[in-house]
Amino acid sequence: MEKKIAVTAGTFDLLHPGHFNTLNFAKKHADELVVIIARDETVKKIKGRSPVIPEEQRKIMIETLKPVDRAVLGSLNDKLEPILEIRPDVIILGPDQTTYQINELKSQLAEHFLYPEVLKVEEYVKCPFHSSYDILKEIVRRWCCKELKV
């Protein structure tokens, strides 16, 4: 019997509870979890800024987490490339993905005769520092203005 493979993807720059929630959710839906780490160049294009932590370090951090079986760097040319190579049974998307994005992904994969189940983590983890942005804001609040007199 073949292992059921799940894939999820993200920047995973400053780890927070939302990341762990997504990874645990993904692992519950498969025997093997592969995480695609967004490339520094891709993050800069999409978010307008480079990640704090370089891609190779983010990959190492993610692949050492308990639910993760393997981490790979995303493609610089085609976001579907690693998915087409892995050929997962399940793709897990974060709570910030829209129905349009999900349907678009399914359509693009179908063009390559790949029909994985696409699941979405439905709820955000509600706690302090549930996003990388919140962590950065708190670091600035605590350190930059007081310690550096900025």
Swiss-Prot record:
ATP binds at residues 11-12, 16-19, 96, 124. InterPro entries: Archaeal_FAD_synthase, Cyt_trans-like, FAD_synth_RibL, Rossmann-like_a/b/a_fold. It catalyses: FMN + ATP + H(+) = FAD + diphosphate. GO terms for molecular function: ATP binding; FMN adenylyltransferase activity. The keyword Nucleotidyltransferase applies. One of its GO terms (biological process) is FMN metabolic process. Homodimer. This is FAD synthase.
